[in-house]
UniProtKB/Swiss-Prot annotation:
Keywords linked to the UniProt accession: Disulfide bond, Glycoprotein, Immunoglobulin domain, Membrane, Repeat, Signal, Transmembrane, Transmembrane helix
The protein's name in its UniProt record: V-set and immunoglobulin domain-containing protein 10
Membrane topology: Single-pass type I membrane protein
Any one biological process term the GO annotation gives: synapse assembly
Source organism (scientific name): Homo sapiens (Human)
All ranges on the Extracellular side of the membrane: 31-413
Basic and acidic residues bias: start-end ranges: 482-500
Gene it is expressed from: VSIG10
Amino acid sequence: MAAGGSAPEPRVLVCLGALLAGWVAVGLEAVVIGEVHENVTLHCGNISGLRGQVTWYRNNSEPVFLLSSNSSLRPAEPRFSLVDATSLHIESLSLGDEGIYTCQEILNVTQWFQVWLQVASGPYQIEVHIVATGTLPNGTLYAARGSQVDFSCNSSSRPPPVVEWWFQALNSSSESFGHNLTVNFFSLLLISPNLQGNYTCLALNQLSKRHRKVTTELLVYYPPPSAPQCWAQMASGSFMLQLTCRWDGGYPDPDFLWIEEPGGVIVGKSKLGVEMLSESQLSDGKKFKCVTSHIVGPESGASCMVQIRGPSLLSEPMKTCFTGGNVTLTCQVSGAYPPAKILWLRNLTQPEVIIQPSSRHLITQDGQNSTLTIHNCSQDLDEGYYICRADSPVGVREMEIWLSVKEPLNIGGIVGTIVSLLLLGLAIISGLLLHYSPVFCWKVGNTSRGQNMDDVMVLVDSEEEEEEEEEEEEDAAVGEQEGAREREELPKEIPKQDHIHRVTALVNGNIEQMGNGFQDLQDDSSEEQSDIVQEEDRPV
């Protein structure tokens, strides 16, 4: 038997073929899934306890012997071995190992068990393609806002994998874009910033449940919506000029290039848009241009320009303050860009020492207008020159203001003097009027009061006036060339040639006598005037 142990094998295979052909229609008892390059174990039924002789076959067009527990039968390949004297162990699976395997067990009776081995492969080499606007130097993809982005994912797998896309925005959970067994391509139209994040392609082998995934970051860029803004200012803590350029509202931050105009000399380039210039680089009227560029912005970019100018000062050259009072000195700066820093100094008592706010000095500034208010003026402390200085990196300007401190005026004395002068003038005018008036008339009394008073009206021709008139007549006769003028002036005087003194008195309100007396006086005056005319007619 030992010598001819291998002789009966052909007859056994023929019998097994006939038996298996009738058994296949019964159905399979187990399905085992393995993966390429992995190992798998196929069990012979579900029986526990004492087992008989086991032989494994593979069902192709005809049964193929693989392995038997009979030590006299060698395995078909070294990859095949028995585990626990019943199970078939296959090493390093390949896609060709997939198929139906049959186990024959001979104990008291012969039993047959079938196992279906399925071999899965992959997914391997997932390839993700995202067609976007561009790629950064580090490999990160970016898309311009409002553009179209195409996504595709490919993987080698058996059976073909199920492809699923996942999206995760910043600081949020993942969400699925759906899965498909056949289509692994989709597009996003008019992409927006809220779709910026990580896109993951997941390929799943439904047979082996093995999956692979590839995550790709996609950034959504957009330029600022408005024009850039630039300005100049004094740097804090130093006497330098700071140029600042801003172009806000875009992502990512743009690039800034400062150049000097005209000439195009590059001042500096940075992501911050800030450049520092020393005084040696500055001059009145010089222009600086900021040129901005964005990765998805217009190719020509955008720009803005600043022009620096030195300050000019305007102030009152002289101010006056009364002792104990208050005075305000003003200083106005115009034309300065960037705005100048305004300082107040003394050039007499405290040369080049900046005046600081105190209880006596109040400094206020509104824009480019500054005021210095001095309280409780003192001639010893406050009188003198004050300097208003405008400091700017472009230039320094100074203006001197003279403050004069005086004693307050005596208002009462001034008013008294004016009143005295008015009274003196009135007295002089009254004296002149009294001196040159020929006739005076005083009316005394008031008949309406009904008082019992004696009212007297008196007309008096003094001896002195008569003598003066006679002298004037004699002088007129001497000067023949002045005769005519003297004759014109003579009627204005009332001569008293008859030297008659008339007195009319009204006593106890006798109105009738007063009227008669007044009439007699008028008659006498008329006679005197007629006598004067007759004398004028006589030859001299």
